[in-house]
A protein has these predicted regions:
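Glycine-rich phosphate-binding loops that contact phosphosugars or nucleotide phosphates
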Residues: 42-149
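Short, glycine-rich nucleotide/cofactor-binding loops
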Residues: 16-26, 111-120
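Catalytic cores of large soluble enzymes that bind and process phosphate-bearing ligands
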Residues: 4, 19-22, 26, 51, ...
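Generic N-terminal amphipathic, Lys/Arg-enriched alpha-helix
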Residues: 1-21
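A short, well-structured juxtamembrane/interface segment
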Residues: 22-38
Length: 149
């Protein structure tokens, strides 16, 4: 292994250890929430825009993965029509409402909202819709970055 590879690996491992140390309780809470929902017939819906939506895509239909994971797919929130358009649309009112309306998400389900900052209109709107419908949410974001955004 080269010096550069060892250095990179060491840095990544230290970051992962820090995240696990700081967030382990939250990870366990989320796992329990998802498990409880699944046992009641619920699904884990995953919402994100731009690159954040890729986590939902990655979790879907994976061998050995969680079968009840369902990405919220909306071409307007992808880069399919261009990055500039997707970036503008994630800041547009009612865009999350439009995307979520395609799915029958109920109070027995979980909505995971993925966002690098948590401040753009679409993830905030998704969270407010979920709250109104009494859908439990999990937020995956960078709190540090969201405080700077």
């Amino acid at each position: 292994m080269s010096k550069l590879t060892r250095s990179y690996s060491s840095k990544i491992n230290s970051i992962l250890k820090k995240i696990l140390k700081e967030e382990e309780k939250k990870f366990l809470q989320c796992a329990k929430l998802i498990s409880k929902s699944y046992k009641k017939g619920g699904q884990l819906y995953i919402f994100g825009t731009g690159h954040s939506r890729l986590l939902g895509e990655e979790s879907f239909h994976r061998a050995g993965g969680f079968a009840a994971a369902c990405p919220i797919r909306d071409d307007d929130l992808s880069f399919k029509k261009g990055a500039r358009k997707a970036t503008a649309l994630e800041r547009t009112p009612n865009i999350a409402k439009k995307a979520l309306a395609k799915y029958k998400i109920t109070s027995k389900d979980i909505l995971m909202i993925v966002s690098n900052s948590g401040v753009n209109h679409a993830p905030v709107e998704a969270a407010l819709i979920a709250k109104k419908k009494k859908i439990k949410t999990i937020s995956l974001t960078s709190v540090k970055y969201s405080k700077q955004a």
